[in-house]
Every structure is written in C-alpha cells, then in structure tokens.
C-alpha cells in the first residue's frame, strides 16, 4: 500500500512538472531555460559510459562547477552535498525570442546506490532554510539516487544544497561500508544545441560554403538571411535566427566555416566527481580504542622509565 502511494505521488509530481514546463513556455517565452527536463526525456541515465554527463551534449561551453561533500558520513544519516555554480552577477543572455534575459541554473547529483534525497521530516532547520524555494526531483522513478534541480533563478541560487540520506548496511545487506563516488553536474544558461540536433540561437552561426556575400535580408521577426554567391555563381542562403549579431556585411569574402555572427553564449556546463566514505560505527569505536591503547602504552612506558631510574639511583648506578 505504501509503495502504491509513493508511485502515485511520483507520477503526480512528474505530471505537475510537465504542466509547469509547458505553461512556462506558452505564457513566459522570454525566460531562459536550463532544463534537465530534456535529458530526462532522452536518456535513461544522465551519465554516459565515457563518464560524460549528457547535459554537455547540448551545453557545449565549459564552465566550472564546484562541489562540497563531507569526507565521511555515518550510516542512516543526513548530510549536505553542496553544488556551487559560479558566474558574474547580473549576467544576461539571449532568450529564445532574441531578448536579453537573466541566466537560470540547474544541477544533477548522481549518488551511489542506496543514497537518496533525505525525506523532509529529517531535514534540520538549517537545511530547510538553505533549500527554501528549491524543488528536487528524481531523475526517474527507477533511479531515486539521481537528484535533479532546475531551472532556478541563477542570481539567487549559485549554491544549491542537496540533503542526502545515507544507507544503513546493518539493516540492508545490499550496501556496505567503504568509499563511494558521486558524479555532479552544474549548468548556467541555455544550451547551444537542442536534443534534436538543431542549433539554438545561443551559438555562433557559420558559413557552410565559400564565396562572396551577395546580400543580407532582414526578416520581420529580426532574423536574417545571408545570401552567399559561390565562385560558380550558385547562391546559397544561411538562415540566422534572432539573437546573435551579424559580424559580416555585403560583399565580404568568406570561407566555409567562417563565423557569420558573434558568440552570444555567456553560460556553460561543468561536471566533477567527488568521494564520500560511509563510515562503520565499529571502525570508529575501534579507532578510538586504538588511540586509547597507544596513549596508555606511552603512559606505561614513561612510568616504567621513571621506575627504572629510581632503581638505578638507589643502587648508585
């Protein structure tokens, strides 16, 4: 009964997210998206066999992502995995309609099997305050160890706190104490390529052929058509959407691959790996006992040395 209830809640959450996504596009087209939604729809796992997180397939620019994870944690305990997505304050980028919009951010944390998002009833007051306004989702119903966040307003969410619950090997023999790896990705801004392979307007547009620019047509929506005349007299047309700025003019000679526009992108994606040790309480107790033993041994050696010195002094040695 509990499992059925959880499934219903997950499906309801996914449905609500989808509605929010669609309504955002329809009613707020100027917003710039850093949606993990696309990866969830197109990839079974967000991490390829090569180790690359799939967000990098659409977000081609690289920018740093920083993660802070405890060196070790106890079993069945809640800890914080902090993802930092740095960029300059008040940075703007080109939206889908060509207007300037604030950057948004998104992040994905791939936890080891058995680790998962901590239930809210176990969040501390500090965690509740740090995660206010942040909505966490699982990558899929089958993968509750992969947590996705975003899109969020970037200027107020450059640091995202993920509350994580560790497994308890004493109650579940599938998990073991030891060192585990986490895979983390953070993104700011729009991608350069859509999952379909089509370019967004947040990328450099280049010429597909060599020749002379015959003419440039400005379309009503603000986009352009660049007509290039090849050496054989054939005319090819390059479509440039609204947003990027042209850096060429009529009668310019260009080669295939030369840029026609500036690079409007100011965002980027970054990923990294981190490690955490699931610490056995018995190991901690053993370590404490070891240190106590070492301390007692040193004390006994000092006492023995003093005793020997007293005997030697009494015997006149």
Curated annotation (Swiss-Prot):
One Pfam family hit: Apocytochr_F_N
Lipid bilayer topology: Single-pass membrane protein
Cell location: Cellular thylakoid membrane
Main subcellular location of this protein, as a coarse class: membrane
Cofactor entry: heme
UniProt cross-references to HAMAP family, sorted A to Z: Cytb6_f_cytF (MF_00610)
Name used for this protein in its record: Cytochrome f
Organism annotation: Prochlorococcus marinus (strain MIT 9301)
Gene name linked to the record: petA
């Amino acid at each position: 009964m509990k499992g059925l209830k959880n499934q219903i809640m997950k499906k309801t959450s996914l449905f609500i997210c989808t509605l929010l996504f669609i309504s955002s596009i329809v009613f707020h087209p100027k917003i710039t998206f850093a949606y993990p939604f696309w990866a969830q729809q197109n990839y079974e796992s967000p991490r390829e066999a090569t180790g690359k997180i799939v967000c990098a397939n659409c977000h081609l620019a690289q920018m740093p992502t920083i993660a802070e994870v405890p060196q070790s944690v106890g079993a069945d305990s809640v800890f914080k995995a902090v993802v930092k997505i740095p960029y300059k304050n008040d940075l703007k980028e080109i939206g889908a309609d060509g207007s300037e919009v604030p950057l948004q951010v998104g992040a994905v944390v791939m936890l080891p099997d058995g680790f998962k998002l901590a239930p809210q009833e176990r969040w501390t007051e500090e965690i509740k305050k740090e995660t206010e306004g942040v909505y966490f989702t699982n990558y899929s119903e089958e993968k509750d160890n992969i947590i996705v966040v975003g899109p969020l307003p970037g200027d107020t969410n450059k640091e995202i706190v993920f509350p994580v619950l560790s497994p308890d090997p004493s109650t579940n023999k599938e998990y073991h104490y030891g060192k585990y790896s986490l895979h983390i990705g953070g993104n700011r801004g729009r991608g350069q390529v859509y999952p379909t392979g089509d370019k967004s307007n947040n990328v450099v547009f280049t010429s597909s052929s060599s020749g002379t620019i015959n003419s440039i047509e400005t379309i009503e929506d603000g986009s352009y058509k660049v007509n290039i005349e090849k050496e054989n007299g054939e005319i090819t047309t390059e479509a440039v959407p609204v947003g990027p700025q042209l850096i060429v003019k009529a009668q310019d000679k260009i080669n295939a691959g030369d840029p026609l526009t500036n690079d409007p992108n100011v965002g980027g994606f970054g990923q990294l790996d981190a490690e955490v040790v699931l610490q056995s309480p018995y190991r901690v107790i053993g370590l404490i006992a070891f240190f106590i033993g070492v301390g007692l041994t040193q004390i006994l050696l000092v006492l023995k040395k003093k005793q020997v010195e007293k005997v030697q002094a009494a015997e006149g040695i």
